[in-house]
Structures are given as structure tokens and as C-alpha cells.
């Protein structure tokens, strides 16, 4: 299995995580171990890497690459939403760094059998974790027109969402939509020809929306940030790399909330809540990949990196 996932902004990530002085760092999106290998090779002799990935293929690929490190690497086939529980299961109550790289890997995109890509014909699946019951095919063939439109509009930010949902419901009355290219055909028919002449592939936003919904990605991200912050030791760092505006908005909002001191209503002249910030923002604006990195790895183009540092002492 060639699970190729070129690690994005790896130098900036390592600089922020500071693994050389860490006891424990968690890579919540281990994948092909691109970031994990760099982290584990930078850890001190007693340092531990905890690698997590919900995709069984990604887990196996990462595990095989990290096996040589013995007990220095603890790897789990699980969702990063369970980050705190996973660490506590192995007796780790605090960590020094957490990384979430939310990009879909080249392997997942290029392996047509996974159903993530609109470039190849494949079963309409899109599950990161094959044990999940719901597939993209089930969503497309059973959800109401209104529900489909909401998903495509909210998670795909697609202005033709209502029309695409309408065309999907019409098409499935004649025959179930079970493959990626069957869905692409319906989407292309729904979007007016003039609107398809520029911009990304006409199916890109709808496929993104279905993938996010099928895998519960945004809810998992929000929960993982909240749980991960509780796990961080004082001065520990949380780095998140996102690849679309919905993810970035959630990370920005969650980090901003955690960095707030006073949460009193603005009409109060004096703070009554005595609130204290939980984190310090390390990136007031997101860091972006260099042009050189984008030329080497075009999929890095949309990446944005945000990071915070845990304040105080929780251990």
C-alpha cells in the first residue's frame, strides 16, 4: 500500500510543536506518518509519540513505518475526537503538543475505491472509517431534497445547492445513484453551463459537503479541540492545519474563545466574571505554505495553519 501523504508546512509545524523538549506529542491524523516520523525523530530519548488515525489503511501504513521505534510510538486506529480517552487509556494524562492535519491524503483521493474523488468512477462511499454505517450513496439516495440542499449549502458552500438537490432527487426516481460519476453527471446537469466555465470542478463542493457529512468532520474537530486543550500541559501547544474555510472558521472560533479573558456582556463597565484565558494565540492570522512548497505539492495550496499555547499549569 502506497499511502502517500506529503506533510504540509512541516518546518513551521515542528518549530511550533518544539518536540525536542517534549515528553509526549500526539499526532491525531497520523496517516502515512509524514509528520509523525519527523516528530518522533526530534523527540528526546524518553519522549513518546501517540499516533491516531480513524482510517484503517492510514493506520496500517503509519503503524508499519513507526514499528521500528518500539514503545516510543503508541499508535491507535481511532477517531481523534477520542484523543483524551485514548491517552488516558495508556496512562498519559498530559501531553506537550497536539497536531491535527485535516487534509485528505493523496492515497485517499487517488484510490478510486474509496469514493472520495470526482475524477474517477467508483462506488459512492466516502467513509474514512469503513465500520461506519452511513455512506454517501445512502445520503444521496434517501435524504429529502431539503436535507440534501442544507448539507450541500452548509458544508460545500455551494450556491447551486438547492438546484443540485432537486436534480439528485429527480434522477434517483429513475435509478439509484451509486457511483461517483453518476453523481458527477447529475451535478453537471444541475449547474448552468455558464457557471461551469470557470472555477473549480463543478462537483468539488458537493463532494466536499457529502464527505464532511458522512464522516461528521466538523463536529469531531470542534470536540477534539475542546478535549485536546484539557489534555495539554502548561505551555503545551496545539497546531491545526486546515484545507477549507469551514474547518478554518471552526479552529479560529474555538481558539479565539479559549484565548478570551472576560466573557461579560459588553454593557457591563467592569468585568464580573473574572475570566482567565486558557490559551495564548501563537498565530493571530493563519500561516500559509510558501510558493515553493505549493509548486512541489499543489495540494498544499489551500492549507492554513493555526496554533495556540496552553496557559497556566494544569498538572
From Swiss-Prot:
For this entry, the protein name equals Ribosomal RNA small subunit methyltransferase H
Similarity section? Belongs to the methyltransferase superfamily. RsmH family.
Which domain of life, per UniProt? Bacteria
Residues reported to bind S-adenosyl-L-methionine: 33-35, 53, 80, 101, 108
Q: What class of enzyme is it?
A: transferase
- Assigned keywords, A-Z: Cytoplasm, Methyltransferase, rRNA processing, S-adenosyl-L-methionine, Transferase
Q: Which InterPro entries match?
A: RsmH (IPR002903), SAM-dep_MeTrfase_MraW_recog (IPR023397), SAM-dependent_MTases_sf (IPR029063)
- List cellular component terms (GO): cytoplasm
GO annotation terms (biological process): rRNA base methylation
What's a single GO MF annotation on this record? Answer: rRNA (cytosine-N4-)-methyltransferase activity
- Enzyme Commission numbers on file: 2.1.1.199
The answer, when asked if Ribonucleoprotein is one of the entry's keywords, is: no
Pfam family membership, one: Methyltransf_5
The residue ranges crossing the membrane are none
Name the HAMAP family on file.
16SrRNA_methyltr_H (MF_01007)
- Subcellular location(s) per record: Cytoplasm
Task: Show the taxonomic lineage.
Answer: Bacteria, Bacillati, Bacillota, Clostridia, Natranaerobiales
Reaction(s) catalyzed by this protein? Answer: cytidine(1402) in 16S rRNA + S-adenosyl-L-methionine = N(4)-methylcytidine(1402) in 16S rRNA + S-adenosyl-L-homocysteine + H(+)
Organism (species): Natranaerobius thermophilus (strain ATCC BAA-1301 / DSM 18059 / JW/NM-WN-LF)
What the protein does comes down to: Specifically methylates the N4 position of cytidine in position 1402 (C1402) of 16S rRNA.
Cite the SUPFAM superfamilies for this sequence.
Putative methyltransferase TM0872, insert domain, S-adenosyl-L-methionine-dependent methyltransferases
Amino acid at each position: 500500500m502506497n499511502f502517500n501523504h506529503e506533510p504540509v508546512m512541516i518546518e513551521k509545524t515542528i518549530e511550533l510543536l518544539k518536540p525536542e523538549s517534549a515528553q509526549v506529542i500526539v499526532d491525531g491524523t497520523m496517516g502515512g506518518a509524514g509528520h509523525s516520523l519527523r516528530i518522533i525523530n526530534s523527540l528526546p530519548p524518553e519522549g513518546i509519540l501517540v499516533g491516531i488515525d480513524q482510517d484503517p489503511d492510514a493506520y496500517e501504513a503509519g503503524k508499519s513505518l513507526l514499528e521500528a521505534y518500539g514503545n516510543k510510538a503508541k499508535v491507535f486506529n481511532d477517531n481523534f475526537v477520542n484523543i483524551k480517552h485514548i491517552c488516558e487509556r495508556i496512562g498519559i494524562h498530559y501531553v506537550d503538543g497536539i497536531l491535527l492535519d485535516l487534509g485528505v491524503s493523496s492515497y485517499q483521493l487517488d484510490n478510486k475505491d474509496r469514493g472520495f474523488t470526482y475524477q474517477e468512477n467508483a462506488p459512492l462511499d466516502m467513509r474514512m472509517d469503513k465500520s461506519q454505517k452511513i455512506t454517501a450513496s445512502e445520503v444521496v439516495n434517501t435524504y429529502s431534497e431539503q436535507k440534501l440542499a442544507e448539507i450541500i449549502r452548509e458544508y460545500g458552500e455551494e450556491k447551486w445547492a438547492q438546484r443540485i438537490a432537486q436534480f439528485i432527487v429527480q434522477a434517483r426516481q429513475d435509478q439509484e445513484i451509486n457511483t461517483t460519476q453518476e453523481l458527477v453527471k447529475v451535478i453537471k446537469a444541475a449547474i448552468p453551463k455558464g457557471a461551469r466555465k470557470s472555477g473549480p470542478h463543478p462537483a468539488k463542493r458537493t463532494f466536499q459537503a457529502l464527505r464532511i457529512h458522512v464522516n461528521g468532520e466538523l463536529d469531531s474537530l470542534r470536540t477534539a479541540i475542546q478535549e485536546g486543550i484539557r489534555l495539554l500541559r502548561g505551555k503545551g501547544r496545539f497546531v491545526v492545519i486546515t484545507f477549507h474555510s469551514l474547518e478554518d472558521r471552526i479552529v479560529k472560533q474555538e481558539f479565539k474563545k479559549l484565548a478570551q479573558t472576560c466573557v461579560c456582556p459588553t454593557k457591563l463597565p467592569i468585568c464580573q466574571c473574572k475570566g482567565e484565558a486558557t490559551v495564548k494565540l501563537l498565530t493571530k492570522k493563519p500561516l500559509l505554505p510558501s510558493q515553493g512548497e505549493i509548486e512541489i505539492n499543489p495540494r498544499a495550496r489551500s492549507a492554513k495553519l493555526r496554533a495556540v499555547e496552553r496557559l497556566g499549569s494544569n498538572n
